[in-house]
Structures are given as C-alpha cells and as structure tokens.
Amino acid sequence: MTNTAENANLCGLNRKDFQTTINGKKTDLYILRNRKGYEVAISNYGGAICAIMVPDKDGNVANVVQGFDSIQALMETDEIYRSTLIGRYGNRICKGRFTLNGKDYQLATNDGPNHLHGGNKGYNLRVWD
C-alpha cells in the first residue's frame, strides 16, 4: 500500500488496489472525511467498510475496524459479510420460505436449509453505482 499525493488518506489505502471490473462494473474505493479528522474508506463492491479512522482523546488517529486493504482481499475473504452491506433481508429466513399477500415464495438457501442475508446474490456481492 502506497500513499501518493493523488490518493492521500489517513488509512494508507491505495485506490488502485480497489480498482477492477466485476461483471462489467468498475469497482473503486471512496474516502469520506470531515474537518475533525474522521475518515471512512468504503468500497463500492458490497459497500464494504475498509477503514474507519478516528482520533482518540489525545488526537492520535487509528483504524477501528477490521477492514480490507485491497479488492482481492475483499473478494477472497471467508467472512463474506464482514464490513459489507447485507440484504435484501438481514438474518435468516427459515427454510428460505415466506408468504406475502397470500403468495408463497421460495428463496435460495445458503445457510443450511435457510436463506441468510440476501442469499447467494446478496448486497455484499454487488458492485454499487
């Protein structure tokens, strides 16, 4: 990870390490910061929070999340929901089935017999525009 003037940030993440194409969509890293020294680094792949930099009471800035240092690390993690968006539904839908307005729906099951956090194509696996 290198920090150049072009991508200077507190967390030391390099935007180029987050730039690739997944299913025809470009991924990137976005840095949000305020005047008080807070900084959040978010990938548009899964909406993953890669770093949150905040100062302590003495003004020392530190990362307070276990994030990712590249798009590759994010894509290869075994903890697929860590720091990412979940959905359409958060938690489990028993046996992946539910009824809405009298109509029965069967969802993909990805947690044993259950549907978890949006299933096999949840928000954590999407590239957000």
Residue ranges of each PLM-predicted region?
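Surface-exposed acidic/polar loop and edge beta-strand patches at domain peripheries
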Residues: T2-D129
